[in-house]
Amino acid sequence: MQLRAKVCIPIAAITLAIGIGCYFIIQKQFEQLNDTNIQNLVEARASQMQQAIELCSEQAMRMAALVSRLPEVEAAYKTALAGNIDDENSATSQKGREMLRASLAPMIDGFAAVIGEKPQIHYHLPPARSFARLWRDKQTKKGDKWVDISDDLTSFRPTVLDVNKNGKALSGVEVGSGGFEIRGLAPVTGLAGNQLGSVEVLVSFTHVLDGLNSGAGQTALLYMNAEHLKFATGLQDKDKHPIVAESYVLVRGTKEGK
């Protein structure tokens, strides 16, 4: 009996030790597997987002090209360029802006009737001044008031400067008055081939984030560095776009992460 006890106790101890060792090994493997799955998911979502941005950028640039050489657009630009386009309150720029709104209204309305929202088409005066944001009734906000002016974009819109300088279309993501948007830009030229300005089409990040939110329990949010708020006037409502950690602004999503 004593011999059996002496044999069984060491075997039991060894078995217990092996069991505990196996438990920790298996637990570690599960943790590593979980970490790997999370990493794979993040990388897959990042790749999916990059592909969606590239696709939306290309579509935006193609749409901008469609509205870059219309005769009525050239007429509106010639009206604006006859005055002082560096004056944000220029009467000739305002007249040209109203010409753009009137001549392109049927196209804007037709798009909205089919798609459910107005296309975000933005014409610029050279080198980088807003001419007409065709999805808005007025151009931009100063404080709490909407104003109809040719606001200056030179300090935060390098893509507009680039297109007006080099005359070549481009696309990508850039901060504007509404925050981060996917953009496609094209030069505006007259029938004689002379460059008059530029035009861009904006695509909301909402379309990209909706695709990323398709998985169960998965939520994608978009944040912007708070330093860009001085330009992104459309994100200055702290109830809709709260500041996080004093450094970031919620652009798309909700406070609850939904």
What are these regions (language model features)?
Residues 83, 206-258:
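Intrinsic low-complexity, intrinsically disordered coil/linker regions enriched in small/polar
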